[in-house]
Amino acid sequence: MTKITEVAAAVIERPGEFLLAQRPAGKPYPGYWEFPGGKIEPGEDPRSALVRELREELGIEVRAATPWITRVYAYTHATVRLHFWRVTAWDGEPQPLEDQDIRWQSVAAPDVAPMLPANAPVLAALALPAVMIVSDATAMGIDRWIERLTALVVQEQVLVQVREKAMEHLRVQHLVSRALTRAEPFGSRVVVNSDSGSFPQATGIHLTSRALMEATARPAALLVGASCHDADQLAQAVRLGLDYAVLGAVKPTASHPGATPLGWERFADLARDLPMPVYAIGGLTRADLAEAREHGAHGVALLSAAFG
């Protein structure tokens, strides 16, 4: 059995930026850029290791950190399991205490190279917005929904999921085209729910849980996610190499009044140690974002509270 080295890795964030460190001479992959962190010692949990490593490596004291994603990568010299945490508050100013270079990078356009192979895919995950909005144009009306979307994307970058199961194909096509025109100039991306049809002009596709379980390979799209409700569906999303999952319902919802919600503890159990970002959905608002992240979510997906 291959020995796996457990590593705590920090995504240290300030508005629009994150911190990378360059590996010094004398270590494997010298000159490569990576997220700060280091090995988890026997008896340590990932958060404790993270706090210790950032104190030793950068001279900062972590005040706020939340679990994010976990990725396994096999290098020629070692196989590592990287436990990524998002660090959003700390005391002190990061300093290179181990002869390494450090640089703040734009989330939208990081410009250092080369990146450690294990860390490069993390940049795509980090670029996903914290909020997904799910369309409700059938009930609201296309013009009104587009008007609300237009006002939103000027202020906030979001991931837009067009999900209109009761709308005819040509009207969905019209909605997708207008959503793309409004959203893309401001950096927001648009995916279309697989129940609404195929629209190659969109950024990507969002699989229903049924379509997810029927899939034998990742769909050919730039961005692919899926709705999940249990561990089996999440495992299938991992097997297909999807870019994100949406997991819920976390709280009671008006659309599914008889369903038993997951609750935050069950959500955390299901989302733990997954390699892709997970959005929490179900009865949530933007006010739930902090709690969602405490339980391992990348962000929240909103329907009724999308514009509230």
Model feature map: region roles:
Residues 1-19, 70:
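Conserved N-terminal beta-strand and adjoining loop/helix that marks the start
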Residues 35-67:
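The catalytic Nudix box helix
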Residues 71-94:
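Active-site-adjacent beta-strand/loop module that shapes the phosphate/pyrophosphate-binding cleft
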Residues 84-86, 94-127:
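NUDIX/MutT-family hydrolases
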Residues 129-145, 223-228:
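Active-site mouth loops of central-metabolism enzymes
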Residues 133, 160, 237, 245, ...:
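Conserved, mostly hydrophobic/aromatic
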Residues 173-191, 209, 216-230, 258-285:
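Alpha-helix-loop-beta-strand connector modules within alpha/beta enzyme cores
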Residues 209-217, 246-258, 283-308:
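Glycine-rich phosphate-binding active-site loops on the catalytic face of alpha/beta enzymes
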